[in-house]
């Protein structure tokens, strides 16, 4: 920019007033080279002497530089880009005094960086520091007193040969200049390190049983870590490396104390982990809990695609990769130059910060479109939004949580992510079947002890005990049974339940699942996840259902995600099995248990007798026999047909189950006479309640009159006693005789008075032991009071 300078019109100027004229190399180098008889000459090596001789020879015949007159570089000033030389010294050329007073054109005054490295005059323009000590008087006047003293000290050191020069740099190349006592301190330090290494490599010796650690002193973590490695090595080959007289329990006890000290765990949780993992895997698990898990994102496919989201975040300075082949929407973040939870994409709802293990339960649930799904413990809403994402905002999702404060985060996340098919509720999950049920699928992320997320919450290491584990397990059992009751087994597309926890203890996982298999009509099905370790079917003294192999466990040291447990159930019946199978309504329809079926008891609480069982069996046989064209009706325990006379059903059944055969033909004749008299009476009477059912306080001669008539369903389910087999033939014969007598027309049967019913030898209730015995007096009185009404008008 600006006007171009015309070099022809530039005035020529000579050297400055303070410019120092540099003398030849023969005078400049003499000051630094020692004299021939000087003692300091012995300090120079052979190579240094050769280089000094070359300088002396070169300083005698120095060719005159081919340089334009008038150019002179001021000492103490360097052109832009030039570096003052510290290595090899080059003798300055002898300058002509006549040329010092002449000056070249303006273009020659400018020295570029390319001229310094590529031009032939670069050595001539370079300023050396050989004459730094011989400053002019004007320069010394500008220096401070302390600077003058420093210059004098430097000059004295130069004369003594201590000044830095290139000969000092060549001492490492010479073998003659190294003294044997050059590095005494380094040798001592190396010897000390070697001694420490020798001490560390000593064999591990288990301390005596009664000896304890020194109180009041902080443990040396390096020694503790070394001892842990030694104990693990001994336990791997215990038979060969153990000390004589020491048991495995002593080594394990010492290892537990060292692990608790080194990793800051409580004794209870560490003992649980030692029961769960082998020793080598235990160390890996403890080390993995000291490192945080990688940050993972879940793409919200309701608003964007994973490819587009990844490109936007990469442009913002986020280093990320796809989460894995098992996930189509996950991204893992390695590092970021922007806060990953405050980007415009996050605020717009394009992604959700969610752990990798939290995506697995929703993938195992596999929700379908247009379904009714329940998320029983939904806060903070990550799994709920993922379910809505897979359902494409169709169907209905009921998101429930017992903590009202945590529901605020659920509302915020669902609004931000654009979820529109979710209803939020605040109920206790244990009472949820009373609120609403009939869901196609249910997801239960039960509250747990959090032993799988120690990297997020290190306080779990010390603040958990046996009571906390048992309390969580009891709550999980209640929630799981409630969730199973909320599932509809008759769903065409569903009937599934996924149970998951962020804990790795057996008490909160396999134990709870095995309990649910015994209490409800469910079975375990595969989760559909291609990776993960199988659940335990046996753990120490416990034995679980073999189908627990289909459950999945995830650990931080093997899968690089939070510890998790996932189980998937399929409900095949909405009924609830009971421990006592007496209730027919609660019995399982698929597998009815008839062996434990109990016959109904009598009203007075006594056990049913053989005769009562025979009566039930006879009634069952009567129901199976083909009846006549005219149907029979049952009213108040009396089977009647229109225009026909009948007798009470229970006494007939009792008569048919007589164990003896002494009556013979006499019983048949008495029956015929009795039936003929009943035909002549006309309208039938209805016995009162007092006559039908005797009071418990007044014992009746009719022993089985108080036995209630069982229902048809109970009759079908009742077992057949073996002792009633011979009496069934008699019952069939007598029943046929009754039907033949009943089919005879009743001509001229005049109705009698009600009082006449109690009189006469043929009473409606007959004792099973004697067919001619009259009824008791109390029953006769109750029947004559006029309470009974005729059955036929």
Swiss-Prot record:
GO cellular component, one term: nucleolus
Residue(s) carrying N6-acetyllysine: 634
Record field: compositional bias (Acidic residues): 98-110, 118-128, 165-178
Composition skew (Basic and acidic residues), residue ranges: 182-192
Cross-link (Glycyl lysine isopeptide (Lys-Gly) (interchain with G-Cter in SUMO2)): 72, 257, 601
Chain residue ranges for the region called Catalytic domain: 356-579
Entry keyword annotation includes Transport: no
UniProt function note: S-adenosyl-L-methionine-dependent methyltransferase that specifically methylates the C(5) position of cytosine 4447 in 28S rRNA. Required for efficient rRNA processing and 60S ribosomal subunit biogenesis. Regulates pre-rRNA processing through non-catalytic complex formation with box C/D snoRNAs and facilitates the recruitment of U3 and U8 snoRNAs to pre-90S ribosomal particles and their stable assembly into snoRNP complexes. May play a role in the regulation of the cell cycle and the increased nucleolar activity that is associated with the cell proliferation.
Protein name: 28S rRNA (cytosine-C(5))-methyltransferase
